[in-house]
């Protein structure tokens, strides 16, 4: 059985972001996902249900040109998106290879995805006033944490996200608040060899 590889797209629950939903469901982007080994595209479309429903009418499962990718969507989950983000997280025991999250540039979403160690494409919503999302996305990309993109450039951003994944593998492991602090190499050597400060 092949491992699943999930691309999860989220627009958040408060503001409409039609352009990102359209771009994520664009045939060229779905094809790019399939070509990069993705098995699932999950779209949290928020207030943009009409766009998703129109996609389903235009591309019912039996008439889709994509045979190796499952496409599904939902409006929002009251319990949050942590479980959906986890679907894009590599977990060999669950048959998942590392996927990707594409998100509006909400700071809460960005922090949660970064904590989970999942490659992230951040797409600021240009319709928001006082667009702090653009500045946040640019700074995080400049520091090498995310891929900042415009919704019209998702195919190119997908390629950049795969490069980001390779760089992330060299990062130290992410420690969540529920994990014990592991001793540093210095602490282990001190304990084993009797070094005293």
Curated annotation (Swiss-Prot):
Enumerate the subcellular locations listed in this protein's record, separating them with semicolons: Endoplasmic reticulum
Q: Which UniProt keywords apply?
A: Endoplasmic reticulum, Glycosyltransferase, Transferase
Regarding protein family, the annotation reads:
Belongs to the glycosyltransferase 28 family.
Q: Which GO CC annotations does the UniProt entry carry?
A: endoplasmic reticulum
Per its record, the protein catalyses:
an N-acetyl-alpha-D-glucosaminyl-diphospho-di-trans,poly-cis-dolichol + UDP-N-acetyl-alpha-D-glucosamine = an N,N'-diacetylchitobiosyl-diphospho-di-trans,poly-cis-dolichol + UDP + H(+)
Top EC class, one word? transferase
What's the name of the protein? UDP-N-acetylglucosamine transferase subunit alg13
Which SUPFAM superfamilies does the UniProt entry name for this protein? UDP-Glycosyltransferase/glycogen phosphorylase (SSF53756)
| Record function comment | Involved in protein N-glycosylation. Essential for the second step of the dolichol-linked oligosaccharide pathway.
State the species of origin. Aspergillus fumigatus (strain ATCC MYA-4609 / CBS 101355 / FGSC A1100 / Af293) (Neosartorya fumigata)
Q: Where is this region: Disordered?
A: 174-197
Q: What is its EC number?
A: 2.4.1.141
Give a GO biological-process term.
Answer: dolichol-linked oligosaccharide biosynthetic process
State the oligomer form and interacting partners: Heterodimer with alg14 to form a functional enzyme.
A GO molecular function annotation here is: N-acetylglucosaminyldiphosphodolichol N-acetylglucosaminyltransferase activity
Q: Which domain of life is it from?
A: Eukaryota
Per its UniProt record, what Pfam families does this chain match?
Glyco_tran_28_C
